[in-house]
Amino acid sequence: MNIYFMGMILSMIVYIVLGLVISRQVKDVNDFFVAGRQAPTFLIVGSLVASYCSTGLFMGDVGEAYAGFYTPFMITAMMLVGGYVIGSVFFGKYLRRSEALTIPEFFGNRFNSRPLRILAAVTAIITMTVYLLSVMQGIGTLMNYVTGVNYNICILLALITFAVLTVTSGSKGVLITDTLMFSIFTGASLIGVVIIVGKLGGWTTAVTNVTKLNPTIFSWSGDLSHLYPTGTENIIWAVMTGLTWVAVCAVGPWQSSRYLMAKNEHTVVRSAVWATIGVTLLEFFLPTVGALLNVYSDQIPSASLSMIWATMNLLPKVLGVIVLTGVLAAGISSATTFLSLIGSSVANDIMVIDDDKKKLRYGRVSIIVVCVVVMILAYFNPPQIYIIMLGVCETPQAA
């Protein structure tokens, strides 16, 4: 058992204990599904950024930049952050005003249509389950590489953590732990960026060295062997993907559902502005460092593990443990958000239940069922983190 595994296990125990403690404050469906609608700006920002990042940022996005697709990817990333403000102003504040428990309920009431409400719920459940699979595989890949522990054991440990956290404390626990996780991985990651760039000789030297090694790493077209054979096609892909992600960040259920928990409409808009700043910082600095890590290409095992390798080999041991624990936390954060949404959609939108206690019970049972399904899929499916994440979000349903 190495120090990284010990750090990850300790963090999982902390999250489980927090979930059990917070569960004492969960009295009804309002607490379980929308955290009592009393969340301040800091908690909403923490949950927005934490549920966005997951392992997809640290392994998928950074991996794409490392693989030579930096400029097209950066176009997409800098476009998508605008979705937060757009979504909060034109959708989020009205969502909060509706006082619905779920987004499908909002649409069902808005258009006075029970079938539409069910369709929205089914769509959310399917997309969130697939995205959850992506996160689960990312966590398993991370833990397996860092600790050497069997991949299946890793995903089982992760599943137990976010299942217990979500089932016991619901959205209230998810909000608080999301914010804790956000603080850990954002702070540690940005400090890590400074140290890694320093070891590369500073920004100017690092860029000079990596472009000597790979002259096309920062080219406008990206690596023409990575996706499409022409720069024009790659840029078109980047813009179209960026527009898709604008919609996802604006109205995607795993993002906009946070607004249902906000204290008021002002909190919704303020949170979106701060989330835009947070995601911009992370999406710029981490993939940029990922591209610079090409100077170690002979030592890095794969693109998706580039930042993980740098954390283990270029950072001080203690900071490395904190960063990797933060990456794990980001994955767990996204997973708890998805599970919370799935549970609320099943109990509140698909099933017709008037009794609050039964609604809570069915919501928790549905979370457990989805966990088992995702565990089975993750066991038989090879990890394809970025492909699954991208596939989910490039469907009309995800937006």
Where are these regions (language model features)?
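Hydrophobic alpha-helical segments and their helix-loop junctions in multi-pass secondary transporters
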Residues: 17-25, 128-136, 142-157, 161-162, ...
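Membrane-interface helix-loop-helix modules in multi-pass membrane proteins
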Residues: 33-100, 236-248, 255-299, 308-330
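Selective recognition of specific alpha-helical transmembrane segments in multi-pass small-molecule
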Residues: 121-134, 165, 183-197, 236-250, ...
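Hydrophobic, small-residue-rich membrane helices and short re-entrant helix-turn-helix hairpins
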Residues: 31, 99-108, 170-180, 251-284, ...
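Helix-loop-helix module between adjacent transmembrane segments
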Residues: 50, 74-168, 236, 240-248, ...
